[in-house]
UniProtKB/Swiss-Prot annotation:
Residues 62-73, 125-144 have a biased composition (Polar residues). It is a peripheral membrane protein. It is found in: Cytoplasm; Nucleus; Cell projection, Cilium membrane; Cell projection, Rhabdomere. PROSITE patterns: TUB_1 (PS01200), TUB_2 (PS01201). InterPro entries: Tubby-like_C, Tubby_C, Tubby_C_CS. Belongs to the TUB family. This is Protein king tubby. GO terms for biological process: protein localization to cilium. The lineage of its organism: Eukaryota, Metazoa, Ecdysozoa, Arthropoda, Hexapoda.
Length: 453
């Protein structure tokens, strides 16, 4: 039986999962201590040269001269050779163009990126303080975990490391306490800080997803990836839900990648049954440049209209690394500034009378924009990976794991995103982001990129 394209990709993913270099969360315990792996107590045998025929009878690497045993090995080797030969013939019959299209269309992790690992770190509690509009805080994460399929699609990103949840002591003396059994934390900077309530939907969904989060409110969300969509799963659909108590959830947004587009173009809608630009629930779109290194988020306005002009909601920029140094992914997010009544400044790149967010940032005109960066993961010698503390919200390493902070207050986490299973990701956000902005930022991390990081 011939080898299918899906089997080829599955084999590639399994191979990648065996290799180190992902970012992991620092809040995960290791399955066994590293010291046990360094034990020298057992005898190792590895000689496979021609003299093993006369080796010690106690050597497990010795080849016995028993004819029947030799015949069994020979038959097994011949059968294996025939199977390999048949597989090669099957591979040659696969349409190369279909294979290239399928592999390039999948969202995968790049070879040279390091995933971020997740490790929970003990953090000292901090006295409750009022939320400040420009305050930003974060935790720690690491890079040594398996690649999922969209990680594999990003294999062309040069020099990106995965992030793992980490379990190391916090480098910040005033960091917030890790969230307790009730799902809340005791610090204002960490996810679920003291005096910070978990947000709920207020009013209509289409209005709520565009409204900036109030100060002092945290929204805990979950993104699920549905691969059962069009074109053999090459264009999955992403669903954003707000998590509630007792496992309940509220649908907020859905997003899908447009098929016939020169660059990556995602449609975002609050109607899960109609993810099109003409739908009543259309909320906006995410569009990338040709390299997939820069993304712009727009609302549902019309760029040709003067009454309802299309507004810029965010710009996401992934740093390029043409030298290919291996390390965590670096990203910059530029948002419209906030007014005194906590509303976004209206910026439209479609208006010839004003500059868009990206143009303002390039000219270093920061009066009406806010610049965020991903929290830099910390290298952990014990796990040999980059780690960040996601406070229990992220459980698997991935290049896509990240936390967004502001340079003026790197303890205040504006948004965090990370993988918990093959097709499930957590996404938490707070002021000044809205659900639409946060979801679009998360979608940009799924997309394949060339020469990034």
């Amino acid at each position: 039986m011939g080898v299918t394209q899906r089997q080829l990709m599955d084999a590639y993913i399994r191979q990648k999962r065996a290799s180190p270099g992902m970012v992991q969360a620092s809040d995960l315990q290791m399955s066994r201590p590293m010291s046990g792996m360094r034990s020298n107590s057992r005898e190792l045998h590895g000689y496979d040269g021609p003299m093993q025929f006369i080796g010690s009878p106690h050597n497990p690497d010795q080849i016995l001269s028993n004819n029947s045993t030799t015949g069994v090995h020979l038959t097994s080797s011949l059968n294996s050779s025939r199977n390999n030969s048949n597989n090669l013939r099957s591979l040659s019959t696969i349409n190369q163009e279909d294979l290239i299209e399928e592999i390039s269309s999948h969202e995968l992790e790049d070879d040279e990126s390091s995933p971020v690992t997740v490790v929970e770190q003990p953090i000292q509690p901090q006295s409750a303080n009022s939320m400040q509009s420009q305050r930003l805080r974060s935790g720690q994460q690491s890079f040594n975990e398996p690649l999922d399929e969209d990680d594999y699609a990003n294999r062309n990103i040069s020099g990106v490391a995965a992030v793992r949840p980490a379990n190391i002591a916090s480098p910040y003396k005033d960091s917030a306490a890790v969230e307790g059994s009730n799902g809340t934390a005791n610090g204002s900077g960490s996810i679920g800080g003291n005096g910070e309530s978990e947000g709920d939907v207020i009013g209509n969904i289409d209005q709520f997803v565009m409204q900036p989060a109030p100060q002092g409110v945290l929204y805990k969300c979950r993104i699920t990836r549905d691969r059962k969509g069009m074109d053999r799963g090459l264009f999955p659909i992403y669903y954003l839900h707000l998590e509630r108590d007792y496992g309940k959830k509220i649908f907020l947004l859905g997003g899908r990648k447009r098929k016939k587009s020169k660059t990556s173009n995602y449609i975002v809608s609050c109607d899960p049954t109609d993810l099109s630009r003409n739908a009543d629930g259309f909320c906006g779109k995410l569009r990338s440049n040709v390299f997939g290194t820069s993304f712009t988020v727009f609302d549902s306005g019309n760029k040709e209209s003067t009454e309802n002009p299309r507004l810029d909601l965010a710009v996401i920029i992934y740093d390029t690394n043409i030298l290919g140094f291996k390390g965590p992914r670096n990203m910059t997010v530029i948002l419209p500034g906030m007014t005194e009544d906590d509303q976004r400044v209206k910026i439209s790149s479609a208006d010839p009378k004003q500059q868009g967010i990206l143009d303002l940032w390039k000219m270093k005109n920061m009066d009406n924009i806010v610049e965020l960066h991903n929290k830099t993961p910390v290298w952990n010698d014990e796990t040999q990976s980059y780690v960040l503390n996601f406070h229990g919200r992220v459980t698997q390493a991935s290049v896509k794991n990240f936390q967004l902070v502001h340079d003026s207050d790197p303890e205040y986490i504006v948004m965090q995103f990370g993988r918990t299973s093959e097709d499930v990701f957590t996404m938490d956000y707070r002021y000044p982001l809205c659900a639409m902005q946060a979801f679009a930022i998360a979608l940009s991390s799924f997309d394949g990129k060339i020469a990034c990081e």
